Amino acid sequence: MDSFVLDAQNPNPKNLKNLLKYEEQLERQHVSLDNILGALDVRNHSLGQLLVLKAKGSDQGKNRSVFIDQCNNFFRNCNVEQVRLAPAQLSQLSKFYTEALYELKQPIRGVAVLKDALNILSDNKPTTTLTPIHTDFLQLCILSKCYHQALPLIESNITHINPEQSSIAIKDILCYFYYSGIIFTAFKKYKKAIEAFKFVITAPASALSAITVEAYKKYLIVYLIQFGSVQHFPKCTPAVVQRNIKSHCKPYTEFVQSFSNGNINDIMNKASSGAEFFQKDSNWGLVKLSIKSTYRRNIKKLTQTFMTLSINDIAEKVSLPKAKAEQFVLKMIEEGEIFATINQKDGMVTFDECFEDFSGPTILNDLDRNINNIVGLESKIKEMDEKISLSNNYLKKLASGKNTGQLSQYEDPMEDIS
């Protein structure tokens, strides 16, 4: 592999592109890869190091700990301009790196590394431009339970996806929003979690994917936690998803149906009968939260009917032991979900009106920030709409549709447009 090392050390940009022809050879040189890597400087020969590390990542017999250290050094010190010449290879290396950390049960080691690496393929705009590294970063945050590291990223608005620049694929996009939903759920930001899962479910599809199935399962349970019932599929859900997904989620759909009459015994029975499936999918905790949310919702309904109730009456009406009912009421008062006071002498609960003040500076600042976000999004949507309207692919589709009279209202104009 002397010729590869010489070409990798040649600073000519045209020569760097030629390095890609060595990929298959490197895949067959697993024994020599560390020596080849040692002959290259990470700063000056980044593309060469990238190809060597990618080849090493595919070696099932590699020393994972050494590989992780080598990747750490590469991601922190590589020449960004060089590695951007090979986005597909960089994305694959990121995945090998993430897998190695998972296999060693050390995902936390990669969180800070990939957080910095987000800039490489996003042109230093990681909060607006989605890349495959984003997905790997979120996966490591979830595996290491470092959710707070991912929150600022997923709360930003992604407005750019460039497959040519980042080699991003539909699986990366779906996984990004699926992982985002998991992280939002961990922070109890259920509405945002629902939107993230909904993105996966409603993404255009010609076949049902495993990611969509898992997103739908979580979507159903989180929707129950937030709203207490689930009516229909989200708008724009592909027909193939609507036709086939329920057969993969039978315990979930049955559990959802048990909420329709609000009978807590029915809900508990369906939860018990599907417990094995829920635990296997790591959704048992969410199922228990959805049951708790039913109790909370029933207690909240009482505040709309009664001014005063005893703890015993509340416990009876929501089918809870007295001590549990009191715990629920105290927790709901503490979290501002209801406004009430408990008289410890006679065990009476007095429900008060909402004392929230919507005129303070915090509310005004939030309102101002949200308005600015909407204005920015509107501007971005107009820009994207104009770009699509003037694209050759769209104009060809439009002309073709006019000639045949078969232009689809939704799918055809957007098909194959990058």
From Swiss-Prot:
Its main location: cytoplasm. InterPro entries: COP9_N (IPR055089), CSN3 (IPR050756), PCI_dom (IPR000717), WH-like_DNA-bd_sf (IPR036388), WH_DNA-bd_sf (IPR036390). It is found in: Cytoplasm; Nucleus. Residues 186-356 form the PCI domain. Pfam families: COP9_hel_rpt, PCI. Keywords: Cytoplasm, Nucleus, Signalosome. One of its GO terms (biological process) is ubiquitin-dependent protein catabolic process. The keyword Nucleus applies. SUPFAM superfamilies: Winged helix' DNA-binding domain. The keyword Nucleus applies. It comes from the Eukaryota. GO terms for cellular component: COP9 signalosome; cytoplasm. Belongs to the CSN3 family. Component of the COP9 signalosome complex (CSN), a complex involved in various cellular and developmental processes. The CSN complex is an essential regulator of the ubiquitin (Ubl) conjugation pathway by mediating the deneddylation of the cullin subunits of E3 ligase complexes, leading to modify the Ubl ligase activity. Component of the CSN complex. The holocomplex is comprised of 8 subunits csn1-8. In the complex, it probably interacts directly with csn2 and csn5. PANTHER family: 26S PROTEASOME NON-ATPASE REGULATORY SUBUNIT 3/COP9 SIGNALOSOME COMPLEX SUBUNIT 3, COP9 SIGNALOSOME COMPLEX SUBUNIT 3. This is COP9 signalosome complex subunit 3.
